[in-house]
Every structure is written in C-alpha cells, then in structure tokens.
Design a protein with these regions (language model features):
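Detector for outer-membrane/organellar transmembrane beta-barrel domains
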Residues: 3-91
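Surface-exposed beta-strand edges and their flanking turn/coil or helix-capping segments
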Residues: 26-28, 59-61, 94-96, 119, ...
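Transmembrane beta-barrel architecture of outer-membrane proteins
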Residues: 29-31, 63-65, 99-103, 133-135
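C-terminal hydrophobic structural anchor segments
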Residues: 71-124
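Outer-membrane beta-barrel "beta-signal"
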Residues: 108-109, 132-144
Length: 144
C-alpha cells in the first residue's frame, strides 16, 4: 500500500492484495481499496472505497462497497460516532447481501480503564423482499 499525508491531519491511503486460488477451477481474489481521512483532537471524518474481484474464488463474483465514518469528541469523557456502508455486487450475484448499513452511538469514558459505547445499528437490504433489521448494542472496553 501507499500512504500520503499531503497536509497535517489528512491521510490518503491506496492499497491492494491478491489471494491466489488453490484449486485450478477457482479464480484468485483481488482486493483494491482507497481511503481518505481527516483527524484532529476534536473530530474525525473518513471515507473508504473497496472493490473485490472473484469473491469466494468464484469467477465474475465481484463486489464493492463505500463506507463513511465520523467521530466527534464532545469533551474528554464523551464522544459520538457514526458509520454508513453501501454494499453492492456486480450483476446482482449477491443481491441478498447487497444493501446499506448504518450505525450511530456514543462512547463514555468512565475513569481511566473503562469505556462503554451504546450504539444502534440498521441493515437495509437492497432486495425489497427482506425487511430492515435493527439492533441495539452495548460495547464495553476494560483495559489495564
């Protein structure tokens, strides 16, 4: 990969990989990605694009995704965050897995070693036959 920092706090990254197929009937997987992000002590913003060829080593099963991220530090103990993803497959081969996902939440730093992050997530499938899914989580981090 290649990482550029054209100005302070701005990061641009381009990278890729190739996973060789082990079976003669399979096709190798190529992953290509680009990322741009800005981060300072008050907030961060980022966007990413990913493209994968031959998903699960199957010829022509290409897919791509766009993601955006944001965090805002309200103070030293509280921050809010969000993420949005759009996933799609070439020629609709994975229509059940295509769609949009979103997440919003808050992180609370409780003392020096504990963080709690309640968050809400939604999955909105592209196919109209499946209803949206909604989830509520409470993530906890304990460190020493």
């Amino acid at each position: 990969g290649l990482t550029l920092t054209p100005i302070k706090n701005l990061f641009i990254r381009l990278y890729g990989s190739f996973n060789e197929a082990t079976e003669k009937t399979d096709k190798g997987i190529t992953n290509l990605a680009s990322f741009i992000g800005f981060k300072n002590k008050s907030f961060s913003l980022a966007a990413e694009y990913n493209y994968q060829t031959n998903t699960k080593y199957t010829d022509g099963h290409d897919q791509s995704g766009v993601s955006t991220y944001a965090t805002i530090n309200l103070n030293k103990k509280v921050g809010i965050f969000g993420r949005w993803d759009y996933l799609t497959s070439k020629d609709k081969w994975n229509e059940e897995g295509d769609g949009m996902a979103g997440m919003v939440g808050a992180e609370f730093r409780i003392g020096k070693y504990i963080k709690l992050a309640p968050n809400f997530r939604i999955w909105s499938p592209k196919s109209g036959s499946t209803p949206n899914s909604y989830y509520a989580y409470l993530n906890a981090s304990f460190s020493l």
